[in-house]
């Protein structure tokens, strides 16, 4: 961990870098927390930003955490996987044999994602996602255990930024 000061890009004030926990809202998910990450913080304006050494690895780890979760996919998680795969709404909808309107309703939470569509989204992400297939083989066997009763139970994904491991809480 570096302990130096520099200027804030927002207000020009001095910033400090400290190791800590950071809610990774930039992912598009309110449920992701990075643990053990260096955070640049400006006391003057309150701006905070994480220092992420391996962004590709972090994004892959997050996709893996979503795909292997035993909880039904949420709309924001579907959006994250689509963007992780680099697909437009039209492309992803065609891949899932649905229309863009239905996909949009899933992503915004206006309509629940059915269990078969949930499994298809995970399978597509595993097939097309960089490096996901090999890492998730064991989890695929547990897909039939997805707990639809827990669909509305809030959960959080904690990602260790240094080891790129994750846990659900």
Regions inferred by a protein language model and the residue ranges of each:
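Recognition helix of helix-turn-helix/homeodomain-like DNA-binding domains
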Residues: 97-113, 121
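N-terminal cysteine/histidine-rich coordination modules
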Residues: 1-65
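DNA major-groove recognition helix of helix-turn-helix/homeodomain DNA-binding modules
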Residues: 115-134
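A short, Lys/Arg-rich alpha-helix, primarily the initiator
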Residues: 59-83
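Short alpha-helical "recognition helix" segments of helix-turn-helix
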Residues: 81, 90-94, 103
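Helix-turn-helix/homeodomain-like alpha-helical modules used for DNA recognition
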Residues: 133-169
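Non-heme di-metal
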Residues: 98, 116, 124, 167-169
């Amino acid at each position: 961990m570096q302990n130096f000061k520099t200027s804030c890009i927002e207000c020009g004030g001095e910033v400090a870098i400290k190791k800590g926990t950071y809610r990774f809202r930039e992912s598009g998910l309110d449920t992701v927390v990075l643990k053990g990450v260096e955070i640049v913080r400006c006391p003057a304006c309150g701006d905070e930003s994480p220092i992420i050494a391996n962004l590709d690895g972090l994004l892959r780890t997050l996709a893996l955490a979503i795909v292997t979760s035993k909880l039904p996919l949420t709309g924001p998680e579907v959006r994250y996987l689509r963007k992780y795969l680099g697909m437009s709404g039209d492309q992803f909808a065609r891949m899932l044999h649905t229309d863009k309107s239905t996909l949009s309703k899933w992503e915004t939470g206006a309509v629940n994602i059915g269990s078969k569509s949930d499994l298809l989204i995970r399978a597509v992400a595993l097939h097309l996602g960089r490096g996901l297939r090999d890492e998730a083989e064991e989890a695929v066997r547990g897909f039939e255990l997805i707990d639809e009763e827990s669909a509305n139970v809030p959960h959080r994904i904690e990602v260790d930024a240094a080891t790129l491991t994750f846990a659900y809480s």
